[in-house]
Amino acid sequence: MSLAGGRAPRKTAGNRLSGLLEKEEEDEFYQTTYGGFTEESGDDEYQGDQSDTEDEVDSDFDIDEGDEPSSDGEAEEPRRKRRVVTKAYKEPLKSLRPRKVSTPAGSSQKTREEKALLPLELQDDGTDSRKSMRQSTAEHTRQTFLRVQERQGQSRRRKGPHCERPLTQEELLREAKITEELNLRSLETYERLEADKKKQVHKKRKCPGPIITYHSVTVPLVGEPGPKEENVDVEGLDPAPMASALAARAGTGPVIPPARCSRTFITFSDDATFEEWFPQGRTPKIPVREVCPVTHRPALYRDPVTDIPYATARAFKIIREAYKKYITAHGLPPTASALGPGPPPPEPLPGSGPRALRQKIVIK
């Protein structure tokens, strides 16, 4: 518990408060804002000898919408007595409201003309409306208005009547020559700037040394070339059904779009780099692809007697029948004596195997 709350109050507490309030200076805010909050002196009681022009109010604002206008003025006195005196503020010694002074008709007309020239903020309509404009703001507005008026007057004097005479042909040619020189200088400057800009463009840097380029594309698929067809004349084999079947298959089949495949190309800039990555060795022999002379298919077997490759059993039978007909017509070949009794065969040449002794029979 604090000491101030526990001790007894002083007997002299508040004696100097009234003196401080009397010495307190009046604040300018309460005198200027909204026309002032202080009451006028001598307004406590109604004074009948005062002129009616001081409190004269327009009839449109004095009469309510629901009330009828009264001609005897009975409601004037109670309305004035209804004001409440504010005790929080000290009444000033003199009234802040300037009293109207009667002026002649000539001066009033001159005043109206001056008000028409002033802005709306500085015009005083003569009514009892209290404005909230400070003195400094009013002075600043007045000076601004005077500066605007002076600027407008100077512009009017400068804009006086001015007529330009038409130029002669000699003057036009002289002006065109000056313009041409200016354009040429501007063009030279522009070309020089463009040349400097081109010099500053970075050139494409080339990589020194060997380069390996990798490029992958899609190309149409090209079939491998097939073996050359051999005409085989075999009795008992009718080629008409095969030809008709192939023609029917080619005519009725759907149109297939060409197939595509992927191809990858690796390019070397020089031969040394290529040989470094792919050293040259012994070239392997590519095996010869043998084809059956009857079916024109890759041969999977070989006839041990005639040494002719074949693909199916039917082709083997056709080859043997052709071999029998050849023997019947021409007899056994010279090398066929090795199969039966007779003189021994000649010695094989060096480097030749058993297959070198066989003679390939060509079937026509």
Curated annotation (Swiss-Prot):
Cross-linked sites for Glycyl lysine isopeptide (Lys-Gly) (interchain with G-Cter in SUMO2): 115
Biased composition (Basic and acidic residues): 127-142
GO molecular function, one term: histone binding
Ranges annotated as biased composition (Acidic residues): 40-75
SMART domains named in the record: YL1_C
Pfam family, one: YL1
Keyword Signal among record annotations: no
Domain of life of the organism encoding this protein: Eukaryota
Record's GO cellular component terms: NuA4 histone acetyltransferase complex; nuclear speck; nucleosome; nucleus; protein-containing complex
DNA-binding region per UniProt: 156-206
Main localization (coarse): nucleus
InterPro entries tied to this protein: Vps72/YL1_C, YL1_N
Chain positions found as Phosphoserine: 129
Region annotated Disordered, chain positions: 1-164, 335-357
Compositionally biased residues, Pro residues: 341-351
Localization of this protein: Nucleus
Keywords of the record: Chromatin regulator, DNA-binding, Isopeptide bond, Nucleus, Phosphoprotein, Transcription, Transcription regulation, Ubl conjugation
GO biological process, one term: somatic stem cell population maintenance
Modification comment: Phosphorylation is enhanced by ZNHIT1 and promotes the interaction of VPS72 with histone H2AZ1.
Keyword Transcription regulation in annotation: yes
Function: Deposition-and-exchange histone chaperone specific for H2AZ1, specifically chaperones H2AZ1 and deposits it into nucleosomes. As component of the SRCAP complex, mediates the ATP-dependent exchange of histone H2AZ1/H2B dimers for nucleosomal H2A/H2B, leading to transcriptional regulation of selected genes by chromatin remodeling.
Stated family: Belongs to the VPS72/YL1 family.
Known partners and oligomeric status: Component of the NuA4 histone acetyltransferase complex which contains the catalytic subunit KAT5/TIP60 and the subunits EP400, TRRAP/PAF400, BRD8/SMAP, EPC1, DMAP1/DNMAP1, RUVBL1/TIP49, RUVBL2, ING3, actin, ACTL6A/BAF53A, MORF4L1/MRG15, MORF4L2/MRGX, MRGBP, YEATS4/GAS41 and VPS72/YL1. Component of a NuA4-related complex which contains EP400, TRRAP/PAF400, SRCAP, BRD8/SMAP, EPC1, DMAP1/DNMAP1, RUVBL1/TIP49, RUVBL2, actin, ACTL6A/BAF53A, VPS72 and YEATS4/GAS41. Also part of a multiprotein complex which contains SRCAP and which binds to H2AZ1/H2AZ.
Record-given protein name: Vacuolar protein sorting-associated protein 72 homolog
Natural source organism: Bos taurus
Phylogenetic lineage: Eukaryota, Metazoa, Chordata, Craniata, Vertebrata
Gene (UniProt): VPS72
